[in-house]
Amino acid sequence: DDLLKRDFKADKPFSKCVTDITEVKGKNGKLYVSAIFDCYDLTAVGLSMDDNMIAELCAATVENTTAAYPEFCGAVLHSDRGSQYTSDSYRAALNEYGVRQSMNSAGGRCHDNARCVSMWARMKNELFYSRGRKSTDYTIEQLKTMIWRYYMSYWNNRRICSSIGGMPPAEKRRRYYSDKTGKPAAAME
């Protein structure tokens, strides 16, 4: 079932998350990147990469996310209807962590998972196209490092996102938890 129905706004962390896979061509092959983004603040909460686009890549992303963020358990996680997301191994990972699966409608359109599609476009533009670079100038190992740093360091902590009030995702998250605890955001670190 499509639990999000193209509504990617969330009023708290881990109430709605989205996931997808993208392909990045490297000098020595293809790299497949699977990520989970929190709709609340656009934080990249989970990331896995491999040279094969198999279901286990997506299951590993779920496992990585729950290891880093135990509060992800119980979230709604939206994806397209790709074979990775309908596989037994992926669904087993969701069930193990109590994550509720949401999938776009049969015969869905790119707008059904627009949040992820736009995140991939931004990453490729900011890492490569806007700098006159090509992903094929880099090896798979170099690409893994670049993409990991882009999301986990730059995107989450420093990139200003206009759609969340002109701040980085980590700042919006700090403010949310600061409001809940009554402690200043700086004390939350």
What function would you assign to each model-found segment?
Residues 1-12, 110, 168-180:
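Basic, flexible linker segments flanking DNA-binding modules
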Residues 79-81, 87-91, 103-125, 139-145, ...:
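RNase H-like two-metal-ion nuclease catalytic core shared by retroviral integrases
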Residues 1-35, 60-61, 69-74, 185, ...:
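Mobile-element integrase/transposase regions
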Residues 41-47, 101-104, 129-131:
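Short small-residue beta-strand/loop micro-motif enriched in glycine and branched aliphatics
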Residues 4, 20, 36, 42, ...:
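Mobile genetic element proteins and their domesticated derivatives, centered on retroelements
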Residues 14, 33, 50, 54, ...:
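Hydrophobic (often cysteine-bearing) scaffold residues that line and stabilize catalytic clefts
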Residues 95, 121-189:
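C-terminal domain-tail junction helix/linker
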